[in-house]
Amino acid sequence: MTQRVRTRFAPSPTGFIHLGNIRSALYPWAFARKMKGDFILRIEDTDVERSTQEAVDVILEAMDWLGLDIDEGPFYQMQRMDRYREVIAQMVAQDLAYPCYMSTEELDALREAQRVRGEKPRYDGTWRPEPGKVLPTPPAGVQPVIRFKNPIGGSVVWDDAVKGRIEISNDELDDLVIARPDGTPTYNFCVVVDDMDMRITHVIRGDDHVNNTPRQINILRALGGTPPIYAHLPTVLNEQGEKMSKRHGAMSVTGYRDAGYLPEAVVNYLARLGWAHGDAEIFSREQFVEWFDLEHLGKSPAQYNPEKLAWLNNHYIKQADNARLAELVKPFIEALGGRVEGGPQLADVMALVKDRANTLQEVAQTALLFYRTEISVAPELAAQHLTDEVRPGIMALADKLGTLPEWKREAIGAAFKEVLGAHGWKMPKLAMPVRLLVAGQLQTPSIDAVLELFGREVVLRRLAG
């Protein structure tokens, strides 16, 4: 019977989650969905000083916004301390781990001496019990760390789904501290116990964890577990070619939401940021899940391209249902000082203004002309466009618009043509002053469409003003 696929996302809640971080959730989520398996969320919060509930909330909010639903969790490492201590005690009892009383000062001196000799700095096994070895006397009043007895000789080998075969000699690995003097377990140990207890079959994570992997595999095997399949993702770089980070100006995932990006655009963009399905650039979440595999994960760092994300967002804005778009854009309009109630139907406005916008913020900026609580015309624009020459044309247009049997864009456009023909004018001569009077600005979508949405009553009142 084939083992059920179980993947996990295991972030540390230290306050910030950017696109590179959330990609490490998207890929295991997609793989679990593709394989009809389980996706688990684990919060690695053992760094008590830096971990906050607010940061956890940001992670959950980002995942919810992107639609990365979980099957189990969130599990919190700080709530599993009893389990970790149980396993540590078991390992000491089975001679898989041992207490080490070497002080920090002694360890620093040891490493400095090794550096002077040109050796790799490492713990030398002073307190490691071996047959026939006499250990030093434990110093009074000193709480030891607990170290894992790393295998001596041989090597750790795994076939990484991204990087291929990796082999690390055990001679390169010293005996890892798995519990601090106060008894709290260390990161690499907790990860192993969690992955084993949660029956994780595939670990898809950033390649900054590659160096941890041989240590984790050795501990896992010592506990009788089977290592999962590892897939270490290359780094995501920012526009300058540096590792993406808050320090280098990366935006948080929820920052993209607040800037007016659609979740489907961000998911589509992230999917291609380190994975490919032929030349496909645009695909739905469902298509992504169907296509996703580990074989086509990229082996080189992926570089963030804001223009590409904006292009994708424009595509999804254009494709979006107008009623849904209206609901999303309304807060942006209100933040700009607009009042949607009493204005044209927002969904109808979306149909007119959405095509050229790269973000919901840009949609709102264009749509705002319909929802200003008051309009005013700058004196210099009035002097330029609302001239004595053009006023008779405006009055003639108002007369024709007032008698239209139907307030439709086509009829409004025909009224413009009649007045333009009678006066021998080009469209801008009449359209510009009408825009100023009705919308308070010179730049708008097509004037006949704008007037149709404003409605006859508003248009005639403003033309008369």
From Swiss-Prot:
Motif 'HIGH' region positions after renumbering to this chain: 11-21
One GO biological process term = glutamyl-tRNA aminoacylation
The reply to whether rRNA-binding figures as a keyword in the UniProt entry is no
Principal localization?
cytoplasm
- SUPFAM superfamilies referenced in this protein's UniProt entry, alphabetically: An anticodon-binding domain of class I aminoacyl-tRNA synthetases (SSF48163), Nucleotidylyl transferase (SSF52374)
Name where it's found. Answer: Cytoplasm
- Signal sequence extent: none
**Motif location ('KMSKS' region)?**
243-247
Entry-linked InterPro entries = aa-tRNA-synth_I_cd-bd, aa-tRNA-synth_I_codon-bd_sub2, aa-tRNA-synth_I_CS, aa_tRNA-synth_I_cd-bd_sf, Glu-tRNA-ligase_bac/mito, Glu-tRNA-synth_I_codon-bd_sub1, Glu/Gln-tRNA-synth, Glu/Gln-tRNA-synth_Ib_cat-dom
Which region ranges are annotated with the description Disordered?
Answer: 120-139
Q: What is its EC number?
A: 6.1.1.17
Binding-site list for ATP: K246
Instruction: Kindly name one Pfam family recorded for this protein.
Output: Anticodon_2
Q: What family classification does the UniProt entry report for this protein?
A: Belongs to the class-I aminoacyl-tRNA synthetase family. Glutamate--tRNA ligase type 1 subfamily.
UniProt protein name: Glutamate--tRNA ligase
Name the species this protein comes from: Ralstonia nicotianae (strain ATCC BAA-1114 / GMI1000)
